[in-house]
Amino acid sequence: MLYTVFCDESCHLQKDNSSVMVLGAMYCLSEKRKQIYSDIRAIKEKHGLNSHFEIKWTKVSESKIEFYLELLDYFWENSDLHYRGLVATGKDKLNHAKYNNDDYDLWYYKMYFRTLDPIIRQENEYHILVDIKDTKGGKRIQKLKEVMCNNIYDFNGEV
């Protein structure tokens, strides 16, 4: 089966004055994706929002609370949607010199591995959408894919 995985992060920059980083992965069978998109657009329009309005928790406000509550109900009630999140605490206390070749971004992608690894199964295929963090992000994402495939003995990168 083919799955689509949507990834996002919060407080992921090294010097953002936050000791916590959150990574999330929402996923569904790819064949269900269009219906889910359509349902979410309809919820936005029902609440007077543009159908292309970007959903962000920082945009939650008293005037949009009913929209966000209905959206949460939709996520909890839709058995086609699945979610995995990772909360990394103590981000400001990490010793990157000792554990990550003095490279914060290496730690960042290790956390993405920890987020996605429990989702990935050898018998399925995945279309994983990850924000490219910076100009080095494309290469890092390719390396993440290679490591994830190797972890499930997919040395040809077919998953």
Stretches with model-predicted labels:
Residues 1-159:
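Phosphate-ester processing/binding pockets and catalytic centers
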